[in-house]
């Protein structure tokens, strides 16, 4: 069977209609006023988070007490207090950083949600159509359409979809329902959806 037979038909137009409201879920991340990467806002169990790559924000920013700012599409600079360590989660092995957002009133935008099929086997996502919202060349937000063509036993996604270095930390979204299935990390993606209990790889949320 040809690969194309696996790709689900989708109404691209309906997806484009909601892109405008989703744009504010993507942010540039600045550390000490220097742009270093991309992140996105997501909602898990009614809690709001900033998710990005471990290669963009890691433990050293806590130790060095650096100032982290977010720049969203309406050009509003939002400061986030990251001094509460219990609300920051790192996973170096899978390259993920998650920061719980307390000041929800400061960020009035669209929070992305995790895909509904979090308990299905990883093979479920093979050949699924995806798109990636990203800041290309550190300028405007672009959307790239593609598909997943491989998932290895480390939950690394190999996809056919245009990205560059500035895409690291961007969300990988299921084209069918516009929900998160992964995050861009270097030259590959990380699948956030597991068949185990937690949708986040190796990360437990603290109540």
Model-derived regions, located:
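Serine endopeptidase catalytic core focused on the charge-relay Asp
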Residues: 23-24, 28-36, 43, 51-158, ...
């Amino acid at each position: 069977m040809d690969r194309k037979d696996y790709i689900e038909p989708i109404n691209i137009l309906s997806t484009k209609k909601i892109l405008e409201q989703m744009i504010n879920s993507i942010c540039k991340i600045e550390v000490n006023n220097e742009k270093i990467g991309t992140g996105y806002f997501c909602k898990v169990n009614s809690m709001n988070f900033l998710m990005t790559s471990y290669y963009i924000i890691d433990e050293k920013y806590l130790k060095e007490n650096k100032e982290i700012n977010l720049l969203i599409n309406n050009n509003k600079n939002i400061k986030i207090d990251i001094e509460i360590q219990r609300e920051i989660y790192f996973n170096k092995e899978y390259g993920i950083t998650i920061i719980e957002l307390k000041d929800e009133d400061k960020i009035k935008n669209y929070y992305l949600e995790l895909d509904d099929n979090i308990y299905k086997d990883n093979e479920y996502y093979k050949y699924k159509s995806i798109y990636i919202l990203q800041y290309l060349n550190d300028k405007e937000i672009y959307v790239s359409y593609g598909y997943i063509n491989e998932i290895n036993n480390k939950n690394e996604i190999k996809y056919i979809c245009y990205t560059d270095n500035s895409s690291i930390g961007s969300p990988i979204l299921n084209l069918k329902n516009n929900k998160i299935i992964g995050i861009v990390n270097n030259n590959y993606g990380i699948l956030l959806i597991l068949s185990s209990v937690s949708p986040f790889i190796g990360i437990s949320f603290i109540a």
